Amino acid sequence: MSNEDYGYDYDYLFKIVLIGDSGVGKSNLLSRFTTDEFNIESKSTIGVEFATRTIEVENKKIKAQIWDTAGQERYRAITSAYYRGAVGALIVYDISKSSSYENCNHWLTELRENADDNVAVGLIGNKSDLAHLRAVPTDEAKNFAMENQMLFTETSALNSDNVDKAFRELIVAIFQMVSKHQVDLSGSGTNNMGSNGAPKGPTISLTPAPKEDKKKKSSNCC
């Protein structure tokens, strides 16, 4: 039985988290992918926000629920709740700031300590429009991604270069893992409904999908 039989407008719901240092452009990547918008005066995210977008993969409707949080030290207390239920992650750095790239190893370690073992991961070198200020060689980042079994893309949230590609590749990778049963979406129990009323099987164990796809903000994370 598909999720549409339960009244849902998607077949799969994937929680994806954006991680990386503050100021690398995570929020603008999120808004560019979900609403095709860019805020030139975007400030560091306070707390957590998420947005959704539905795409089609192999004739299945995939609803990506993408979470974004600030990278400052004081927000790391929300780590366990932020990563819980995530089946995909994008680690973002700024190609013009070497420190943001060097910290990717920390973010990868934190992800692996708090997320499922089979979470799909992509590395994003954002702000490719600042090529004249490049501080991180593409080949170096690409090799780091390969060594750690991550997808790799350089993007520009400003002019939208490769943003769609980066998210779609991750979503497809998650879908392929689900198809191979490398990710357990069924939860516990034997019936078709989770305790929160969301159908089991093809749906990630989250709360039922929100009726609105607009960003939700909260200064105090779950």
Swiss-Prot record:
Q: List, as start-end ranges, the regions of compositional bias called Low complexity.
A: 186-197
Task: Give the start-end ranges of region Disordered.
Answer: 186-222
Kindly give the membrane topology term recorded for this protein.
Lipid-anchor
Q: Name the domain of life this protein comes from.
A: Eukaryota
Query: Motif Effector region at which residues?
Result: 42-50
Give the matching Pfam families: Ras (PF00071)
What GO cellular-component annotations does this UniProt entry give? cellular bud neck; cytosol; endosome; Golgi apparatus; Golgi membrane; mitochondrial outer membrane; recycling endosome
Quaternary state and interactors: Interacts with YIF1, YIP3, YIP4 and YIP5. Interacts with the GEF SEC2. Interacts with TRS130.
Name the UniProt record assigns to this protein: GTP-binding protein YPT32/YPT11
User: Species name for this entry?
Assistant: Saccharomyces cerevisiae (strain ATCC 204508 / S288c)
